[in-house]
Amino acid sequence: MKGGDELARKWSWYFRNLNENNKLLLINFKKALLYRGIKEETVFEYQKDMKNLMEYLQKLNIRTLDVTNRDIREYLDTLNVSAPRKIRIICVLNLFYSHNAKKGYCENPMKDIDTSELREQLKKGDSNDK
């Protein structure tokens, strides 16, 4: 399948700066998402969102599975994206951490992240991606 080969090449290049633990976490996350029936292109977009968080955490010497709610909030504050994009990122992070929490690898730091303020922005019409 040509599309799958191209995506695999893009994946390996795009995630080259991540440490081995983070690469393994992303591979397992990808498998879980594909098992749920999520399209490969969507999975790649979700992985890009996770990669951005992982790179941020690596710079701070914080292990991805040791992240706290505060770390997540600080990361989200650094993002210069629209409300819809930030909501999607929060959903992706919640999927990732819920998956790993169910496996017993970590606590879910996303459980107290509230998107109501962002959703209110959507109602007011702030839907342009930055």
Predicted regions and their residues:
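Short, Lys/Arg-enriched N-terminal segments with co-localized hydrophobic residues
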Residues: 1-6
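A detector for short, charged/polar N-terminal pre-domain segments
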Residues: 13-23
